[in-house]
């Protein structure tokens, strides 16, 4: 048992170390990119751990060993588009890990070889070599997958040096002088899966080179120019006819073709009868007329034809002829893009077309109208054309009974909902209507079994309630419209992917996730979210779903309103439940008011709060009135701050409470027993000292109303109040006086007590301080001549 366990443990250790080594290797990748930096030499400050070095598009003219000697970890070196003229491969002898070397688009004329075996990618194309730069050392590059060469002379002897290598792709760029000493069989020994030959771009194609390399699966020929009618593109047609010898050839690509219409049809006809299965022609310039001829569609291996970017002169022949050639091709896949095609005929019989792509043309929505011979068609792309009426497309699709995918995006389609039957083909599963002029009415007529629907970049403001019930719809893209809410899944019960970013969604429905139980991907970012109470539940629901469901969260989900929250991520947006729940807010306010009311009632009952409030108001009013009385009026002949009138029964309170608390602040109080002048009548003394006092204080109590002299003093003071218009009466209620106990002849006292505010003597000692402060404030004024005595009267 011990030995097997030890073996297992050892294997685990080895596996862990191997994984760690791989991880460290990946983490140690150091890529240095300095393209287009006007460098004339390889920089000297390169890090020693550099693994990828890109020095393309500079002015480097020389590469020395010392330039890269220290870069022992270098695996990728890109020096294309420089000015290298000479190269000694020995400069890489210390870069034993070098695998990728790109020296294309330089001025190399001479190359000196050195043994190297690690290269997988070597590109010497687009240089100034006379003969192909193939050394015998190249034969040792057993790992070589890509080889780019260039030269004006191609000799079999050079090619034989690498004939035994199984290279995935060979790029051969022929110089402008190619053809002077041409060896037609020079490529016979090339062993590669993909061969790309670039012919001289400015010369007529009059080459004898045999391009039918026996091992080639994919062949690409660039710069084909044959426009001279006397030759009829015979050289190139002869080269194509030899392709029939290579039974392995499956892919043929022609780039940058300039020829006549007749030669173009001849090229198609020759390729039609070769082993080629996939034929692509791009960047074509056509001229001249097209002579009528029958096209032979029989005996072909071709499955797909792609024609891209065609420029032609003004047609001088009926276009229907060329359209009929294309329409009746017996292939499965047909692509014509960027050809300015304005129409396409319906095949004359049931077509084998499975996939048709007419992207970027000038087709109208009348294309294939009433065509019943495309019943096998599965995919149709009419992207970037001149389609305007969706109803016509609907009627056309109805006859394509096998159509599963339709792309009519980037047109000017409208849907008027004008009563035309919604007759989409029942087989349609994928529909792309993006970048058109469609509104929400399009939802009333959609293929019933569609699974993927793309409506982004239209003019949809809302999804009508009476939409077509798309029970099979799984993916819906309505991005870049004007929708104001997330659509529910009532009509889309199988919806799993929704893209609705860049709309006008401000308050997403809180029940979206409840309605769309099958949603697994939601992209709703970059909308003008209004961060208010209505958004809280939606943000909360996002927190309940898996993070990978909401695409772009949280970076693409930010507040747009209010201004104070603009730019804030919805994840960081918070509002208190109190501000958003009306019931809770009402209950909280009611409870708060109740607590305040109870607290106020308690304060009133326990601390007699109303009394304090009244005293404070009186003190404030007194201070306010004092500031508005002219100083001259106050100081005219006053000798006392106050004249005090009280009953003899209350004298103890006056002497023990009132006088000590008022006279300690230099306040002069007039009492009759201290200041009345002997010999004068009592009435004369009362009148005289009331006039010499700033205020008259009356200490009211049940004893006061029983005193006759107190009544006189009150009468004269009240008379003085109305005579001079002053506010000199202060009433102190020492003890409560019931209204019924006041004699009828004391009508002035009744009037004063009912109209004027009086000070009520508090029985609680803690209130005495405020009482005396209020009283002092009401009588405290600066006297010009301070009386030496104090006047008070006792009755």
UniProtKB/Swiss-Prot annotation:
Disulfide bonds listed in the record: 113-135, 226-233, 346-371, 422-445
Protein name: Toll-like receptor 1
Membrane topology reported for the UniProt record: Single-pass type I membrane protein
Name of the coding gene: Tlr1
Extracellular side: 26-582
Organism field: Mus musculus (Mouse)
InterPro entries per record: Cys-rich_flank_reg_C, Leu-rich_rpt, Leu-rich_rpt_typical-subtyp, LRR_dom_sf, TIR_dom, Toll-like_receptor, Toll_tir_struct_dom_sf
Lineage of producing organism: Eukaryota, Metazoa, Chordata, Craniata, Vertebrata
GO biological process terms on file: activation of NF-kappaB-inducing kinase activity; cellular response to triacyl bacterial lipopeptide; defense response; detection of triacyl bacterial lipopeptide; innate immune response; macrophage activation; microglial cell activation; positive regulation of interleukin-6 production
Location (main, coarse): membrane
Transmembrane spans: 583-603
Span of domain TIR: 638-779
SUPFAM superfamilies per record: L domain-like (SSF52058), Toll/Interleukin receptor TIR domain (SSF52200)
Function: Participates in the innate immune response to microbial agents. Specifically recognizes diacylated and triacylated lipopeptides. Cooperates with TLR2 to mediate the innate immune response to bacterial lipoproteins or lipopeptides. Forms the activation cluster TLR2:TLR1:CD14 in response to triacylated lipopeptides, this cluster triggers signaling from the cell surface and subsequently is targeted to the Golgi in a lipid-raft dependent pathway. Acts via MYD88 and TRAF6, leading to NF-kappa-B activation, cytokine secretion and the inflammatory response.
Domain LRRCT, residue spans: 524-579
């Amino acid at each position: 048992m011990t030995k097997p366990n030890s073996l297992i443990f050892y294997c685990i250790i080895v596996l862990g170390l191997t994984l760690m080594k791989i991880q460290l290797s990946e983490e140690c990748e150091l890529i240095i990119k300095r393209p287009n930096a006007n460098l004339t030499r390889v920089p000297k400050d390169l890090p020693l751990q550099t693994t990828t070095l890109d020095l393309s598009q500079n002015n480097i003219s020389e590469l020395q060993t010392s330039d890269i000697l220290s870069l022992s970890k270098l695996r990728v070196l890109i020096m294309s588009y420089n000015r290298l003229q000479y190269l000694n491969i020995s400069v890489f002898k210390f870069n034993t890990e070098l695998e990728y070397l790109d020296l294309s688009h330089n001025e190399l004329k001479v190359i000196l070889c050195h043994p190297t075996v690690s290269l997988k990618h070597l590109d010497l194309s687009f240089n100034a070599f006379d003969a192909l730069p193939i050394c015998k050392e190249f034969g040792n590059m057993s790992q070589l997958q890509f080889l780019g060469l260039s030269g004006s002379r191609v000799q079999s002897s050079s090619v034989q040096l690498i004939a035994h290598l199984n290279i995935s792709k060979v790029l051969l760029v022929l110089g402008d002088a190619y053809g002077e000493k041409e060896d037609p069989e020079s490529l016979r020994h090339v062993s590669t899966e993909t061969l790309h030959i670039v012919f001289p771009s400015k010369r007529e194609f009059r080459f004898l080179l045999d391009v039918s390399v026996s091992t080639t699966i994919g062949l690409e020929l660039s710069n084909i120019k044959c426009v001279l009618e006397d030759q009829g593109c015979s050289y190139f047609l002869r080269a194509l006819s030899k392709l029939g010898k290579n039974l392995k050839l499956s892919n043929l690509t022609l780039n940058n073709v300039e020829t006549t219409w007749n030669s173009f049809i001849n090229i198609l006809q020759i390729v039609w009868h070769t082993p080629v299965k996939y034929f692509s022609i791009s960047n074509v310039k056509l001229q001249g007329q097209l002579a009528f001829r029958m096209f032979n569609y029989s005996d072909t291996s071709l499955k797909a034809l792609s024609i891209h970017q065609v420029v032609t002169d003004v047609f001088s022949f009926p276009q229907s002829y060329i359209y009929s050639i294309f329409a009746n091709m017996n292939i499965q896949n047909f692509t014509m893009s960027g050809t300015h095609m304005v129409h396409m005929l319906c095949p004359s019989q049931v077509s084998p077309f499975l996939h048709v792509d007419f992207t970027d043309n000038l087709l109208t929505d009348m294309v294939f109208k009433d065509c019943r011979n495309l019943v096998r068609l599965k995919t149709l792309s009419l992207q970037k054309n001149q389609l305007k009426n969706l109803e016509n497309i609907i009627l056309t699709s109805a006859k394509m009974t096998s159509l599963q995918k339709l792309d009519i995006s980037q047109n000017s389609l409208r849907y008027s909902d004008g009563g035309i039957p919604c007759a989409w083909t029942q087989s349609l599963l994928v529909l792309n209507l993006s970048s058109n002029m469609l509104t929400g009415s399009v939802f009333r007529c959609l293929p019933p079994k569609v699974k993927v629907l793309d409506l982004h970049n239209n003019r949809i403001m809302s999804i009508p309630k009476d939409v077509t019930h798309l029970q099979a719809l799984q993916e819906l893209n309505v991005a870049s419209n004007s929708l104001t809410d997330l659509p529910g899944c009532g009509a889309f019960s199988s919806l799993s992917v929704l893209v609705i970013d860049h709309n006008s969604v401000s308050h997403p429905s809180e029940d979206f996730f409840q309605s769309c139980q099958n949603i697994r991907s939601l992209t709703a970012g970059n909308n003008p979210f209004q961060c208010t109470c209505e958004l809280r539940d939606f943000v909360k629901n996002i927190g309940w779903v898996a993070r990978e469901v909401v695409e772009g969260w949280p970076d693409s989900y930010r507040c747009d309103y209010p201004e104070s929250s603009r730019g804030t991520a919805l994840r960081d947006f918070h509002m208190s439940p109190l501000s958003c729940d009306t019931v809770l807010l009402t209950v909280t306010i009611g409870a708060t008011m109740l607590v305040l009311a109870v607290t106020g009632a308690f304060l009133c009952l326990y601390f007699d709060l109303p009394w304090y409030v009244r005293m404070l108001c009186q003190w404030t009013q007194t201070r306010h009135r004092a500031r508005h009385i002219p100083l001259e009026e106050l100081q005219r002949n006053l000798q006392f701050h106050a004249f005090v009138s009280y009953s003899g029964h209350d004298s103890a309170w006056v002497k023990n409470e009132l006088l000590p608390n008022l006279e300690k602040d230099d306040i002069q109080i007039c009492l009759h027993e201290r200041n009345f002048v002997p010999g004068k009548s009592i009435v004369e003394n009362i009148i005289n000292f009331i006039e010499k006092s700033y205020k008259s204080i009356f200490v009211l109590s049940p004893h006061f109303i029983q005193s006759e002299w107190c009544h006189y003093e009150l009468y004269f003071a009240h008379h003085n109040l109305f005579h001079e218009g002053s506010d000199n009466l202060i009433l102190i209620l020492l003890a409560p006086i019931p209204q019924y106990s006041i004699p009828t002849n004391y009508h002035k006292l009744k009037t004063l007590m009912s109209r004027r505010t009086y000070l009520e003597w508090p029985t609680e000692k803690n209130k005495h301080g405020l009482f005396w402060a209020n009283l002092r404030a009401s009588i405290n004024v600066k006297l010009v001549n301070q009386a030496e005595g104090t006047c008070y009267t006792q009755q």
